């Protein structure tokens, strides 16, 4: 059974009902004298101090945003987490965003700016914002820019961007001339004409690359974040944990991905120092240059620098890194693709490994723009295609979790209770 609530039953009111109520008498006052007597007695002997009321646990999880700033703001407001000025109003709520703030949509920069602001504001009210890395965050860190649009680049442009673009092209021409012997080793040539280069590196491109560098405003911010988090009985991440990786502790997964980012940054800096690449090279351009360098080294009559060769080979193996593997936590789609029978057993093993009851993931857009609980409500798939201009039928949504027991899908026009606690048992609301 799915429990529906009207649009007027706002999430703000629902959340406030969950907070500790103020004490109020359900009886009429017997009279002024009785009231004053009770006050005086209270002043004379207050008794032992009362323990503070337990704060009702409330978590809101949001799936992939993909630069859809307007709908992201809308669902945050619908969930009662921000006001019209985009300031935090969620009080003690924990907001979890499971990655893919970026790419495809028109305003990824505004989305990140809002998350950065809320991360600072929420703790002042007793709340918390947890921003997790998705595969698209990793892609931007490493320079895999296949889903970055010209509009996205333009958001980083300023009055000097055209000049920077021209200077970058001139640097590229010089690099291409000095590395002609390497480029000859490539099976496919890197772009040769000015028009091709400019089309692939539009105005704002150079600034975007700097912003995502280790020193850049967004690059530094993203590098501070984790890939997976456990809050209460729930595990949150972008893609999922493959059963073959369930032997890794959650902290190990996070540290492993951070180490891979550091390894990438270090390798890129080495390549820059050796003048193998230029600072604004994309991942594909870096890979091509490294492959050409490695091929030339092997053909050279000069004895190979074994350490250098190992670094080059190691870099080209990034596809096997935990952060890039198809069965890794940022890319895995098994929770969506498994049959119910296959997944039920697999999920049990994963949850047991982490002493958790449920996993919440994004990454794979759900049909009809609806969240989907699976495997006996032990997995919640919450990517509902917020960027509807890219995902037809998609919509903004938020998964609201009360006390690790009640799970509600919040949409802009309605609420759907997916799991409703009913005494000692839990009543399921969404059929598989």
Locate predicted features:
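N-terminal secretory signal peptides that target proteins for export/translocation
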Residues: 1-27
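A generic signature of intrinsically disordered, low-complexity regions enriched in glycine/proline
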Residues: 30-31, 387
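Short intrinsically disordered, low-complexity coil segments enriched in acidic
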Residues: 2-3, 31, 125
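Feature recognizes metal-dependent phosphohydrolase scaffolds
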Residues: 13, 22, 42-432
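Bacterial N-terminal signal peptides
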Residues: 33-42
């Amino acid at each position: 059974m799915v429990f529906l609530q009207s649009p007027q039953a706002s999430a703000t009111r629902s959340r406030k009902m969950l907070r500790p109520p103020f004490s109020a008498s359900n009886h009429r006052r017997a009279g002024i004298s009785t009231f004053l007597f009770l006050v005086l007695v209270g002043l004379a002997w207050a008794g032992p101090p009362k323990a503070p009321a337990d704060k009702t646990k409330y978590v809101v999880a949001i799936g992939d945003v993909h630069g859809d700033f307007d709908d992201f703001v809308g669902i945050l407001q619908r969930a009662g987490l921000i006001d019209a000025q985009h300031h935090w109003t969620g009080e003690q709520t924990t907001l979890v965003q499971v990655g893919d703030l970026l790419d495809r949509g028109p305003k990824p920069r505004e989305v990140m700016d809002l998350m950065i602001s809320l991360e600072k504001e929420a703790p002042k009210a007793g709340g918390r914002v947890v921003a997790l890395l998705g595969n698209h965050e990793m892609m931007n860190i490493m320079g895999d820019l296949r889903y970055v649009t010209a509009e996205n680049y333009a958001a980083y442009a300023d009055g000097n961007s055209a000049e920077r673009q021209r200077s970058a092209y001139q640097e590229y021409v010089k690099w291409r001339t000095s590395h002609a012997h390497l480029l000859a080793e490539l099976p496919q040539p890197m772009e040769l004409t000015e028009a091709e280069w400019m089309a692939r590196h539009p105005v704002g491109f150079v600034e975007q690359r700097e912003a995502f560098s280790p020193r850049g405003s967004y690059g530094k911010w993203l590098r501070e974040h984790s890939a997976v988090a456990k809050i209460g009985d729930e595990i949150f991440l972008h893609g999922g944990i493959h059963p073959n990786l369930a032997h890794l502790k959650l902290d190990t997964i996070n540290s492993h991905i951070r180490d891979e980012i550091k390894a990438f940054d270090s390798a890129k800096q080495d390549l820059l120092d050796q003048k193998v690449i230029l600072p604004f090279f994309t991942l594909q351009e870096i890979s091509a240059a490294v492959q050409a360098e490695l091929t030339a080294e092997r053909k050279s009559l000069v004895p190979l620098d074994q350490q250098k060769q190992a670094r080059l080979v190691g870099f080209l193996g990034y596809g096997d890194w935990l952060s890039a593997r198809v069965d890794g936590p940022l890319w895995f789609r098994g929770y969506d693709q498994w049959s119910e029978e296959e997944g039920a057993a697999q999920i049990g093993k994963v949850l047991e490994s982490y002493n958790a009851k449920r996993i919440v993931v994004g990454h794979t857009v759900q049909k009809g723009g609806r969240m989907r609980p699976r495997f006996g409500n032990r997995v919640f798939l919450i990517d509902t295609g917020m960027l509807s201009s890219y995902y037809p039928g998609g919509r903004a949504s938020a998964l609201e979790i009360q006390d690790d027991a009640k799970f509600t899908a919040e949409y802009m026009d309605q609420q759907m209770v997916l799991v409703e606690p009913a005494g000692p048992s839990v009543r399921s609301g969404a059929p598989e």
